[in-house]
Amino acid sequence: MTISFDDFMKVDIRLGRIVTAEPFPQARKPALRLTIDFGDEIGVRKSSAQITRHYTPEALVGRQVLAVVNFPPRQIGPFMSEVLTLGVPDADGEVVLIGPGHDVPLGGRMF
């Protein structure tokens, strides 16, 4: 399927910094609850991410990540996930987070 550039631009993908990460034992699959700061325009949002194979909560704090910020919130057990944190699968299908190679300003939009 081919989409237009205008369609792509409808997906608002922004850069944020993880400020807290904690286990999410109520999730069906191993996951972490993340709090991500997207800067002044977007603010702080929450996300649930199945990333426990490669990341500990402590290692995630301060890490910059990309997330879709304009999907509707999604209830995951007792937790409301407000953004979709982006990653790609490794050779075993486990999620590897996507982020910049250098520190960049919070809230930057991917294009």
Question: Where do the protein language model's features map onto the residues?
Answer:
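Phosphate-backbone binding interfaces of nucleic-acid-interacting proteins
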Residues: 1-111
